A protein has these predicted regions:
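Short, surface-exposed beta-strand/loop micro-motifs that present aromatic residues
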Residues: 30, 132-138, 403-412
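Soluble acyl-CoA-dependent acyltransferase catalytic core bearing the H(X)4D motif
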Residues: 2-20, 33-383
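An N-terminal structural lobe/cap that precedes and organizes the functional/catalytic core
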Residues: 22-24
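Low-complexity, glycine/alanine/valine/leucine- and proline-rich hydrophobic stretches
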Residues: 365-440
């Protein structure tokens, strides 16, 4: 399938505010530069000549950016070399395109970066030259539409990104803004001077694989064919996992584990086994945790920023395999429970003390490669509420194939109580993972 670009516009706010610079917290500036997080929304054609009318979308976008004004700005470096947002109202990129095939030709709507459903920019020109948000509406021969979104992570996490997209869609339907954006990041400043109270191992170097260098099954030097798969777990599957995790605390009271905790425990065990890791191999599970309602006092509902911290259960691969599922699930439960106000405030201070050269790139993707894993929980996000007036999306998901070790729990679009689990693994590992994961 080929995509042909038909129009490109820089959409600006309907009205401009005085130019200001928005300070970014340490949670913001740790995000990688020169990268837009890609997501895709797919909509089936519902009839009518005005289906996904670009004029309607752009008019609503202009109105939305009055409230979400930093999104129309540009990244820049302040006098101390720290990233901030210049709220100059230059706007965001809105592109239109046509596909020579039908939406059904895409199959399961998995990531297809080769098609070009999301705009690209030239990062070599510097952080102040490209928009913070990139949008592309692609029409298929069947009438269906893909909305591709590229989102610069310095401005916020996924919770806030979806807040913006859903507010834009509400305005397109003629609704008023129900949750105003809250931009003041003062609540995320470190103490002066910073004084972390905990040792934050989540920012330390990750464990190395305990295999000989000539073991090509785990060597980064040997290319492996990576495959992406999405697995559906029904309500019955999830209930079966929970039934296998009945547990009690030290006082004999029953512990209730969440859907995410039991799924993450199951996935962690299966990935370690599929990778063929030795029993004495240490493995880290990175769990992104939203701090909005864990910090005290809780942050405002429309708090627009990166407020994601990392819970980090650690185990030996042999422990995960020799113990019942509730062993892994209990480690996950306890790591998440630890993420209270004191721990999160300490993490902010700890990040502030890290040398500036230890950025997201040097701390980043290696934390999630074998023997480690990251499981992001998107299952509670209102991903399917982006109705621009022509119905809700039939699919919303990642626009690029995630690297090995970065995985997602997502809501099922049918809202039937099940969830989806998406991940990438080397082909030979994926085949074994599928057998293990489906054995519930």
């Amino acid at each position: 399938m080929k995509i042909k670009l038909t129009n490109s516009t820089m959409v600006k706010p309907l009205s401009l505010r005085p130019t200001t610079n928005l300070w970014l917290s340490t949670l913001d500036i740790q995000m990688p530069t020169d990268y837009h997080v890609p997501t895709l929304y797919f909509y089936r054609f519902t009839g009518g000549a005005d289906f996904f009318d670009p004029a309607v979308l752009k008019a609503a976008l202009s109105r939305a950016m009055v409230e979400f004004y930093p999104i129309a700005g540009r990244l820049q470096m302040d006098n101390n070399g720290r990233i901030e947002i210049n709220c100059n109202g230059e706007g965001l990129l809105f592109m239109e395109a046509e596909a020579d095939g039908e939406m059904g030709d895409l199959g399961d709507f998995g990531p297809k970066p080769e098609l070009g459903l999301i705009p690209t920019v030239d990062y070599s020109l510097g952080i102040s030259t490209y928009p913070i948000v990139l949008l592309q509406v692609t029409r298929f021969k069947c009438g269906g539409v893909c909305l591709g979104v590229g989102y610069e992570h310095h401005i916020s996490d996924g919770y806030s990104a979806i807040h913006f997209i859903n507010t834009w869609s509400d305005i397109a339907r003629g609704l008023n803004i129900t949750i105003p954006a809250f931009w003041d990041r003062t609540d995320l400043r470190p103490q002066s001077p910073p004084n972390p109270r905990f040792t934050h191992i989540e920012f330390h170097a990750s464990p190395q694989i305990k295999t000989p260098q000539n073991d090509t099954n785990h060597s980064d030097a040997v290319p492996h064919e990576t495959v992406f798969s999405t697995f559906k777990l029904t309500r019955d599957h999830l209930n079966a996992l929970k039934a296998n995790c009945k547990d009690e605390d030290d006082d004999g009271k029953a512990i209730t584990y969440s859907t995410y905790e039991v799924l993450a425990g199951h996935a962690w065990r299966c990935v370690c086994k599929a990778r063929g890791l030795p029993e004495n191999q240490e493995t880290w599970l990175s769990i992104p945790v939203d701090g909005r309602f864990r910090l005290q006092p809780p942050l405002p509902k429309g708090y627009f920023a990166n407020v994601i911290f990392t819970a980090l259960p650690i185990a030996l691969c042999g422990e995960l395999q020799s113990n019942p599922l509730k062993f892994a699930v209990g480690k996950i439960h306890n790591a998440i429970a630890r993420m209270d106000n004191d721990y999160l405030r300490s993490a902010i201070d700890y990040l502030e003390l890290l040398p500036s050269e230890i950025d997201a790139h040097s701390r980043g993707m290696h934390l999630f490669k074998s023997p480690n894993l990251l499981i992001s929980n998107w299952s509670k996000l209102p991903m399917y509420d982006a109705d621009f007036g022509w119905g809700k999306p039939v699919h919303m998901g990642a626009g690029a194939i995630p690297p090995d070790g970065i995985t997602y729990v997502m809501p099922n679009p049918t809202n039937d109580g099940g969830v989806l689990y998406a991940l990438s693994l080397p082909k030979e590992q994926m085949e074994l993972f599928e057998k293990l994961f489906n054995d519930i």
